[in-house]
Regions:
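Predominantly extracellular/secreted Zn2+-dependent metalloproteases
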Residues: 1-110, 125-202
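Short alpha-helix carrying the canonical HExxH Zn2+-binding catalytic motif
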Residues: 108-121
């Protein structure tokens, strides 16, 4: 039950989610216990970069988003409309942009596992790219070569570098590319996180 991330290390993680204590407890319980999510958040768990969790009022069609304020400060933000006094409360067949089969989700707690894993995949992808980007001194060809040398696929690199123009992708295109990549390759990762959650909390 404790093979997840070390949430108690404030050098690595900050929680600005205490305004909704039930949601905060759900979130931290999943993070502490889930090794799949720990692997996705390894850059943060090891302290290379910092991750802040928070709540924000958003449009109904947004569950959460992940971004970075600087290269060492990332933010995972959940829609406060869905973090209620009862905890995470969202329609089980709710919002999806990677073609995930949401009929697998049986409870709102499981819906939070799916959302958290989805956002952890984003955080992981951003951290991998930014690590290479900084190692390359922000050069586009050098970033490409570092990612290739580390074994990342052309499809992964295409999220960030437009192979037609050899320029960085726009934020909008990057978002589309990343969701397409997740649609093809990351359903199994979400399944694994969900399965581990069920085994931990059954």
């Amino acid at each position: 039950m404790t093979d997840g991330v070390n949430i108690n290390d404030s050098r690595h993680f900050t929680f600005n989610t205490n305004s909704q204590p039930v949601f905060n407890e759900q979130l931290t319980s999943i993070l502490k216990s889930n090794s799949v999510i720990k692997t996705l958040l390894s850059y943060f768990d090891k302290g290379y970069v910092h991750l802040t969790f928070s709540l924000e009022d958003m449009a109904e069609n947004v569950t959460a988003y992940t971004t970075w304020k600087s290269f060492d400060s990332y933010h995972m933000v959940f829609n406060s409309q869905y973090a209620t006094e009862q905890g995470w409360d969202i329609p089980l067949d709710g919002i999806d942009n990677i073609g995930y089969d949401r009929s697998k989700i049986k409870t709102t707690d499981e819906a939070l596992v799916v959302t958290l894993t989805h956002e952890a995949i984003h955080a992981n992808h951003f951290a991998i790219f930014n690590d290479a980007f900084l190692q390359a001194d922000k050069g586009i060809y050098e970033t490409y070569n570092i990612l290739q040398e580390k074994g990342y696929s052309q499809e992964f690199i295409d999220i960030f570098i437009d192979k037609k123009t050899n320029e960085w992708t726009s934020n909008e295109q990057r978002d589309i590319n990343m969701h397409e990549y997740m649609k093809k390759y990351d359903h199994d990762v979400i399944d694994a996180a969900l399965e581990e959650y069920r085994n931990d909390f059954k």
